[in-house]
Amino acid sequence: IESMYIVLISSSPYNTIVRQLRYIFNLEKNYSYADVDVLASNTFKYIEPISDDAIAKEIILEYANEISTNQENEVVIIIAHGPVSQADNVQELLIMNNIADYISNNSNFSEVRSFTLQDDAGKAIRDNNINNIRQYIKNSSMQGKRVLVVSNLMSGKGIQKNIEKDLNGLNYTFNSKGLLTHPKFKIWIEDSITK
């Protein structure tokens, strides 16, 4: 084997799991969880997470369009898993806001907003993020807007059930598909390998 490409199934580089794996592949000086053996070899080619790549933006816009009926009267919420630390969360939200800007500029949606759950952070942090999302949905509904929820989650069967439970009782439409299930994700991998 001349080259082995490592594709992390993560939508963002701003989390401790990605940092630990980067450490293992000798791309990060400090480990996140455990000081383990480092794989220092030119055979391994590490591909950065999809983040706000053009293909990620296109996929998420397609997922919003799939559940849209009248863009001018709809708001789109993009929900990310989110990291543990607040510093990483700031960086993650920059990525998410780039995606939101792309969707706004390539559609007629009334508004596009990004949120992170910080699903593995402390309960108080996660609860605060959920409350912010719920309040945004309530306010949008009171303004007569239809609320569409999409995500940059990788799979379609991860924390989506938790999101549905967290938003129970609110009026919204959720496209729970993940980036991995879209045919363009394979194109992104192929493009990343040839860069």
Residue spans of the language-model regions?
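Extended amphipathic ligand-handling, pore-lining, and cofactor/metal-binding catalytic surfaces
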Residues: 1-195
